[in-house]
Amino acid sequence: MKITYLDGRRLYYAFISGAREVIANKKELNRINLFPVADGDTGSNLARTLSVVRSEAIKDDSLQNTLDSMGEAALKGAIGNSGIIFAQFINGLKINVDKADSISVDKFARAVEKAVDYTYQGINNPVEGTILTVMKEWSESLKKLKNDSNDFAELMEKSLNYASLSLKNTKNQLAVLKEADVVDSGAQAFVLFLEGIVGFIKNGNLKDLKTEKISEIKSFSEDEIGREEEIKYRYCTEAYLEQLKIEIPELKERVSDLGDSLII
């Protein structure tokens, strides 16, 4: 089926499908979690983050309204580096769809490009070979492919190939991944998210997308690859801020010495 526009309902079902694929693979994502620290919780953190969005997002005809609800839920439910990066990306999309009820392939590609930029800007020290790289290179593929077709189904399927290639290359970009011969866990999660969307477009059934209750998810898998190492900042800390009276750069400067992976 050809899909020439993306509205709120289509986005909602696409997101639910992508989230289900990530959640279904949380144990494997935990197992290969080595960067930024080998704490074996990327899958669990993303499963919790996406489960909150899945349960709290509003399915509306308007793309902007649906994204507004997703962005709010993502920020409040985000856990861990990858969870917060996902939340940043969703909010980047929310900001850049220009209050539209629906958008074309061309406008979607532009919104994704801006959303990726927004995500990078929120990170104090962005590192390549991670979920960020796959997001960026997937976005670049959308820019290339949008001129060939106005069909979202074709765009998503072809761009998934670029994202998959980018994922495979993460093990060549970070020494810790190359040593263990695994890809980046967060990057793998993003590709799984895209695979879930493409799978739904091709073979999906709305009856299969029933929202499930958020279950208790263990933080570690039994067979994780993690190595023995000293972790200076062992725990993630998230804070939801409203009505800031200072600019983002100043806030970053004030809290930059409180950890080694800052995302605002």
Task: Identify the residue ranges that each predicted region occupies.
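N-terminal loops that bind phosphate or other acidic moieties
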Residues: 1-264
